[in-house]
Amino acid sequence: MAELDPFGAPAGAPGGPALGNGVAGAGEEDPAAAFLAQQESEIAGIENDEAFAILDGGAPGPQAHGEPPGGPDAVDGVMNGEYYQESNGPTDSYAAISEVDRLQSEPESIRKWREEQTERLEALDANSRKQEAEWKEKAVKELEEWYARQDEQLQKTKASNRVADEAFYKQPFADVIGYVTNINHPCYSLEQAAEEAFVNDIDESSPGTEWERVARLCDFNPKSSKQAKDVSRMRSVLISLKQAPLVH
């Protein structure tokens, strides 16, 4: 009885002719082992080809131009007839997909509105910068005018004060109160001012005012400590003569 091989085919007699599919007898290579070895060789070749295509970053290399990755149904990465190739990892891929989705889903009216808004904001910024420059220039001009008005008002006030001083020192007893306006020397004393006022009054004197002019030269302050002698009696006499001059 003939022996069976692993696939169930009867083995021929030793030295006999080849059987069935032309495989030799028991002394030749096993067909199953040859098939398994061929499959392992093909798988190893495919793995080696894919290994050479891996880039340094770990992402698969770019595929040939044509069908996008993932087959005909993968249209998310298509833009202008060409598919997007990932270059810098998943972040760029997600950003590109989001941008493509936005461009594909954004209506023309919204895109036009966004452009108009950009132009309007630029115009507003330019207008605000122009107004700011004008306001600064106007503020500088108004400040200069304010300083000019202040200086003019100060000069007028000084002139008015000088006129008021002259009018004040021309009235009676001005020599006792203070200096006259035409005194420029710092050592000009109150007595010298009173004497000058008395000399000026001589030409303008009228009858009956002699004792009044004399009283101007006297210090009627009872608390004065400059006097060494008691002159209260003389003071009272001069006051009475001032009030009731002697009749000649």
UniProtKB/Swiss-Prot annotation:
Assembly and partners are described as: Clathrin coats are formed from molecules containing 3 heavy chains and 3 light chains. Interacts with CALY; the interaction stimulates clathrin self-assembly and clathrin-mediated endocytosis. Interacts with CKAP5 and TACC3 forming the TACC3/ch-TOG/clathrin complex located at spindle inter-microtubules bridges; the complex implicates clathrin triskelions.
- Source organism, top-level taxon: Eukaryota
Instruction: Give residue spans, biased composition: Gly residues.
Output: 13-25
The protein's job, in short, is: Clathrin is the major protein of the polyhedral coat of coated pits and vesicles. Acts as a component of the TACC3/ch-TOG/clathrin complex proposed to contribute to stabilization of kinetochore fibers of the mitotic spindle by acting as inter-microtubule bridge.
InterPro entries for the chain = Clathrin_L-chain (IPR000996)
One Pfam family per UniProt: Clathrin_lg_ch
Region annotation (Disordered) ranges: 1-93
| This protein's name | Clathrin light chain A
| Keyword flag Nuclease | no
Per the record, the GO terms for biological process are:
cell division; clathrin coat assembly; clathrin-dependent endocytosis; endocytosis; intracellular protein transport; synaptic vesicle endocytosis
Where, per the database record, does this protein carry Phosphoserine? S105, S206, S236
State the family it belongs to.
Belongs to the clathrin light chain family.
Main subcellular location: membrane
| Record membrane topology | Peripheral membrane protein
Report keywords, A-Z.
Answer: Acetylation, Calcium, Cell cycle, Cell division, Coated pit, Cytoplasm, Cytoplasmic vesicle, Cytoskeleton, Membrane, Mitosis, Phosphoprotein
Locate the region Involved in binding clathrin heavy chain. Answer: 100-162
In this UniProt entry, the residues modified to N6-acetyllysine are: K223, K242
GO molecular function annotations of the record: clathrin heavy chain binding; GTPase binding; peptide binding; protein-containing complex binding; structural molecule activity
Organism, as annotated: Rattus norvegicus
Q: Where in the cell is it found?
A: Cytoplasmic vesicle membrane; Membrane, Coated pit; Cytoplasm, Cytoskeleton, Spindle
